[in-house]
């Protein structure tokens, strides 16, 4: 059975914007690569490699509390779900192979059954991981069967609610990823007020991270480059949703010029 939905036949088509998952597949974590199917097949066999850590072998169910390498970064990546996108991409590229879609859907709902209401869990709801996971959950909307779609929307709404909560918001690049997640899910849910709030907060965060000349407050040179790419991705997401940036975009380009001067 082909689990990749025909969105034109859905009763949900007016309540959400299915253009969002299509156009928000931007950035290196969310775009296809030649090795996608090989990696996805490995994951379905129970092999998960979260760089730079060694391979982890899991059974028929993912052990969400696992910490095999005693590494916070590993558990962060596990709960961020960015590793799951290779399965989503393979499911959408090979709809005749329904096992990929089933795995993606099962993983999303399995995680949600355990952690959706455990918002104080120190790992599952880590800042930045929550924003990245939200993006992944939105991008796979076409894979969710009709009989699970209402529950799926509840999962997204809960993520949107938590990302919109100022008390859970952090600064820096972690906050940047939280706000990108909020922008994407608000756009998908057609929540224009929340979408505008995410955009406003993104610009506010940018203004707190960059001075008027486009210099980032992060001291390390490597982070100047990372921040440029992260912010460029965020600005791309805003523009994909029809939000113009004006002076903020120009200041980001100025920061790129500063970086070029540093490395001369």
Positions of predicted regions on the chain:
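Extreme N-terminal leader/anchor segments
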Residues: 1-58
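Alpha-helical protein-protein interaction elements
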Residues: 4, 21-22, 56, 66, ...
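Short alpha-helical hairpin
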Residues: 47-65, 74-79
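Aromatic-lined, polymer-binding surfaces characteristic
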Residues: 61, 71-252
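Eukaryotic acidic, Ser/Thr-rich intrinsically disordered low-complexity regions
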Residues: 260-263
């Amino acid at each position: 059975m082909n689990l990749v939905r025909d969105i034109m036949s859905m009763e949900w088509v007016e309540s959400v914007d299915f253009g969002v998952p299509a156009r928000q597949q931007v950035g290196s974590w969310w775009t296809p690569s030649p090795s996608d199917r090989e990696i996805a097949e490995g994951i379905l066999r129970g092999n998960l490699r979260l760089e730079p850590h060694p391979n982890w072998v899991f059974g028929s169910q993912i052990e969400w509390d696992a910490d095999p390498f005693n590494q916070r970064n590993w558990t962060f990546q596990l709960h961020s779900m960015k590793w799951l996108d290779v399965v989503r991409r393979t499911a959408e590229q090979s709809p005749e192979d329904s096992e990929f879609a089933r795995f993606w859907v099962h993983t999303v709902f399995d995680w949600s059954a355990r952690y959706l209401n455990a918002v104080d869990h120190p790992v599952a709801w880590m800042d930045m991981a929550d924003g990245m996971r939200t993006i992944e959950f939105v991008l796979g909307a076409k894979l969710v069967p009709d009989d699970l779609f209402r529950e799926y929307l509840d999962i997204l709404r809960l993520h949107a609610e938590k990302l919109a909560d100022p008390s859970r918001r952090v600064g820096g690049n972690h906050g940047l990823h939280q706000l990108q997640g909020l922008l994407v899910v608000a756009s998908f849910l057609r929540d224009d007020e929340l979408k505008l709030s995410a955009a406003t907060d993104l610009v506010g965060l940018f203004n707190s991270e960059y001075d008027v000349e486009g210099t980032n407050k992060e001291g390390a040179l490597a982070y100047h480059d990372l921040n440029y790419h992260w912010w460029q991705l965020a600005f791309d997401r805003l523009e994909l949703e029809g939000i113009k940036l004006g002076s903020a975009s120009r200041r980001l380009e100025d920061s790129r010029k500063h970086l070029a001067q540093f490395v001369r």
